[in-house]
A protein has these predicted regions:
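Class I SAM-dependent methyltransferase Rossmann-like catalytic core
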Residues: 1-24
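Conserved phosphate-coordination/catalytic loops
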Residues: 6-14, 231, 291, 321-325
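Conserved proline-anchored active-site loop of SAM-dependent methyltransferases
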Residues: 13, 19, 29-43, 54-59, ...
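Class I S-adenosyl-L-methionine-dependent methyltransferase module
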Residues: 46, 50-287
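Adenosine-cofactor binding site in Rossmann-like domains, unifying the SAM/SAH pocket
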Residues: 57, 65, 69, 288-299, ...
């Protein structure tokens, strides 16, 4: 399947072709919450509009798209460390979106446990430098994806041994560790859960107390209950240490478990895959008809004979320029529009009507849940939409 735009959390990449098919021809095309620019990318390929405007209140988004089209990343080879990421993410859009977890522009893409391995893989593939792999005890000059797929046990064993010795400062019997690993992980999970429960009891606290302390709603149930159990993140764990009796450092109690879970896809190097997406954008043309803006959606002047597309932040999830998005203000703005306005969302007020819906799997969800993505227009534009579609036939 062709990929559109650049890697971005919540990207409409998988739905771009279906969504753009809904739009009638017009002179101008506005993508007011452009994000990863997947919709604009598809619209440019279809070439049914004379002028294109990409806008996002986060200036990094439209800039990254245009930089990619202009070939800025043709010779990009940098390895971005965790420290580099947090120093550069606010000023370097490539770093922010191609080196962040889930392409969210906020958190570094690799856990601390797997970062040394990913760095070694990057050096081997990009710089043909195998010295870091040699440090792990992996003696090879072939770190292709295929070689790694064919030698997973050897690599895991040597990397775990290196990590435990050099990072955890622990000597482990790796062969013994690998026996019945699934059962060991399951048993260890229960021991970790019991460790958290004991800390709660020693402190005379209840899960609801933890929720109040963390400012969460029911998350404590995942830490102390059996249903959908999960261990706190390092940040949350270290915060909990100030509230309940959790004596062991995070790395000691969970470091090995996190390492084992991180090693499931050794051959993958997500940063290079993201870079390849950017490089493919160089083939786009019609740049002279593409305008970049960085404003609030309601500050954009919409010209006559236009199509407006809005992929708004969903309620209870994303922020808008680090602020809560005012959905009511947006709904009122839509009702005033005279040019056709299309909105992607799961639900909208009764003044809007759904013109299409698509089954969509959210890969960023811990449950990989299927959702129904809908495209709406304001009800007062329904007759206009039908007329414009008829004119295109």
């Amino acid at each position: 399947m062709k990929k559109y735009g650049f890697p971005y959390k919540g990207s409409k990449n998988k739905l771009a072709e279906k969504i753009v098919k809904l739009f009638p021809d017009a002179e101008n095309f506005y993508d007011l919450f452009c994000g990863g620019c997947a919709i604009t990318h598809r619209a440019l390929i279809e070439d049914r509009w004379k002028n294109y405007v990409i806008n996002d209140i986060d200036s990094r988004c439209p800039k990254l798209f245009l930089d990619a089209i202009n070939g800025k990343f043709k010779n990009e080879t940098r390895w971005i460390s965790r420290e580099d990421f947090y120093n550069l993410k606010d000023t370097d859009a490539y770093v922010a979106f191609c080196w962040s977890f889930g392409n969210n522009g906020k958190g570094y893409m690799y856990s601390k446990e797997i970062e040394p391995y990913k760095k070694a893989l990057h050096y081997a593939r990009v710089f043909n430098d195998f010295s870091l792999f040699n440090d792990f005890g992996v003696k090879t000059s072939d770190c292709s994806r295929m070689w790694i797929i064919e030698h997973p046990d050897e690599i895991k064993q040597k990397y775990i041994l290196w990590y435990c010795k050099n990072i955890l400062h622990s000597e482990l019997d790796i062969l013994e560790l690998q026996k019945n690993l699934t059962e060991k992980v399951k048993k260890n999970n229960e021991e970790l859960r019991q460790y958290l429960i004991n800390g709660l009891k020693k402190s005379n606290k209840r899960p609801c107390d933890v929720d109040r302390f963390l400012g969460t709603n029911g998350m404590a149930g995942h830490y102390f209950g059996k249903s959908q159990w999960e261990f706190p993140t390092r940040e949350v764990y270290e915060k909990l240490q100030t509230f309940i009796c959790l004596e062991k450092p995070y790395l000691e109690i969970y470091g090995l478990q996190e390492l084992l879970e991180s090693l499931q896809s050794l051959q993958s190097l997500q940063s290079l895959e993201s870079l390849e997406r950017l490089e493919r954008l160089q083939s786009l043309e019609r740049l002279e008809r593409l305008e970049r803006l960085c404003k609030s959606y309601d500050e954009i002047e919409i010209k006559p004979n236009s199509i407006i597309y809005c992929d708004i932040p969903y309620k209870g999830t994303d922020k808008y320029n680090n602020l809560d998005f005012d959905h009511e203000a947006f709904f009122n703005w839509c009702k005033k529009q005279t040019e056709l306005c299309f909105i992607s969302s799961y639900e909208m007020p009764e003044d809007f009507i759904s013109i299409a819906e698509f089954n969509h799997r959210c890969t960023l969800s811990c449950k990989n849940q299927a959702t129904i993505e809908k495209v709406f227009i304001p009800k007062h534009q329904l007759d206009l939409y039908k007329a414009r579609l008829s004119a295109c036939i």
